[in-house]
Swiss-Prot record:
Belongs to the cation diffusion facilitator (CDF) transporter (TC 2.A.4) family. FieF subfamily. Divalent metal cation transporter which exports Zn(2+), Cd(2+) and possibly Fe(2+). May be involved in zinc and iron detoxification by efflux. Its main location: membrane. It comes from Escherichia coli O127:H6 (strain E2348/69 / EPEC). InterPro entries: Cation_efflux (IPR002524), Cation_efflux_CTD (IPR027470), Cation_efflux_CTD_sf (IPR036837), Cation_efflux_FieF (IPR023783), Cation_efflux_TMD_sf (IPR027469), CDF_Transporter (IPR050291). This is Cation-efflux pump FieF. It is a multi-pass membrane protein.
């Protein structure tokens, strides 16, 4: 695992924790001053943000540790556990928003000064957009599942802050139940994001194969190599930033072992150039044994 990956992922986790802490302080004041249930919803979400981002920070540092005798494949799955924990945090906040929104829908309470809430929400919106932009850049560079989960969480915050602005504006003109209705809508969106995030984390923990596009790229690389007659048993998975790729290459029976090994090494290097940092295992099979084993070439 390269140093660049660790540096970028750690910075993203630290930035998220710092931003969530700042926004929490701002929203505590805004809720105390206005009494807005939508701002209370945002405040609770910021509390969840801090817990999730702190979890991310600790887990990311653990996942960056190199493989050892007890963890031969590294600690990358810790990122998936962090994403799963985040989905649980977010689901809890969504439930709280439902209950609070229903309470204020039944008994609406006028806000003291919606103008202050509007200003605070605009500041929160700008700060969150900056953070999401940085996280998106980090995800493009690292493909970190933990940072991607955090980014999806803060993307929902952008939507939430936009909805809060609209709710505050409507409340300003006397639509006091709009505040509670938007809190319910925000809760639904947050719950959806949490379920999607949890599903992706579970799939990673269950060793889901790489996307079809990436597997096809691997097959195309193998098919383009001289000396390779076919291939079968492509197996892939991902743990943290590391892709694990296994494939059997079919070669002519008459090919010397040294040359077959050389071809396999060249294919491995080609795959690593396309997917840096991957763990690639290649097995060479004589063409004559493939039909007897009941295998079917992926290149035919």
């Amino acid at each position: 695992m390269n140093q660049s990956y660790g540096r970028l992922v750690s910075r993203a986790a630290i930035a998220a924790t710092a931003m969530a802490s700042l926004l929490l302080l701002i929203k505590i004041f805004a809720w105390w001053y206005t009494g807005s249930v939508s701002i209370l919803a945002a405040l609770v979400d910021s509390l969840v943000d801090i817990g999730a981002s702190l979890t991310n920070l600790l887990v990311v540092r653990y996942s960056l540790q190199p493989a050892d005798d007890n963890h031969s494949f590294g600690h990358g799955k810790a990122e998936s556990l962090a994403a799963l924990a985040q989905s649980m945090f977010i689901s809890g906040s969504a439930l709280f928003l439902f209950l609070t929104g229903i309470q204020h829908l039944v008994s609406p309470t006028p806000m003291t000064d919606p103008g202050v809430g509007v200003i605070v929400t605009i500041v929160a919106l700008i700060c969150t957009i900056i953070l999401v932009s940085f996280q998106r850049w980090v995800v493009r560079r690292t493909q970190s599942q933990a940072v991607r989960a955090d980014m999806l969480h803060y993307q929902s915050d952008v939507m939430m802050n936009g909805a809060i602005l609209l709710a505050l504006g409507l409340s300003w003109y006397g639509w006091h139940r709009a505040d509670a209705l938007f809190a319910l809508g925000i809760g639904i969106y947050i719950l959806y994001s949490a379920l999607r995030m949890g599903y992706e984390a579970v799939q990673s923990l269950l060793d889901r194969a790489l996307p079809d596009e990436e597997r096809q790229e691997i097959i195309d690389i193998v098919a383009s190599w001289p000396g390779v007659s076919g291939a079968h048993d492509l197996r892939t998975r991902q743990s943290g930033p590391t892709r694990f790729i296994q494939i059997h290459l079919e070669m002519e029976d008459s090919l010397p072992l040294v040359q077959a090994h050389m071809v396999a090494d060249q294919v491995e290097q080609a795959i690593l150039r396309r997917f840096p940092g991957s763990d690639v295992i290649i097995h060479q099979d004589p063409c004559s044994v493939v039909p007897r084993e009941g295998k079917r070439s992926m290149l035919s």
